[in-house]
Curated annotation (Swiss-Prot):
Name of the molecule in the record: Translational regulator CsrA
HAMAP family (alphabetical): CsrA (MF_00167)
Statement: the UniProt record of this protein carries the keyword Repressor: yes
GO molecular function, a single term: mRNA 5'-UTR binding
Subcellular location: Cytoplasm
Gene3D superfamilies noted in UniProt: Translational regulator CsrA (2.60.40.4380)
Residues annotated as transmembrane: none
Record keywords: Activator, Cytoplasm, Repressor, RNA-binding, Translation regulation
Gene Ontology process terms (BP): mRNA catabolic process; negative regulation of translational initiation; positive regulation of translational initiation; regulation of carbohydrate metabolic process
GO-annotated cellular components: cytosol
Family: Belongs to the CsrA/RsmA family.
Pfam families: CsrA (PF02599)
Subunit relationships: Homodimer; the beta-strands of each monomer intercalate to form a hydrophobic core, while the alpha-helices form wings that extend away from the core.
Originating species: Shewanella amazonensis (strain ATCC BAA-1098 / SB2B)
Amino acid sequence: MLILTRRVGETLMIGDEVTVTVLGVKGNQVRIGVNAPKEVSVHREEIYQRIQSEKTGSPEGGNY
């Protein structure tokens, strides 16, 4: 895992077309902005996992 330090307003690049910008820090929460082409899906991890479990039909954690 690559670990980077960024300040508010600073950006990092992922490949040539994806940027991640630190928008703000409040306590232990960080607000980030992601710019990516429409064909690149961007999800929070818990949402991505739910999408994947719905695709396979295996409910996660018994919440269904």
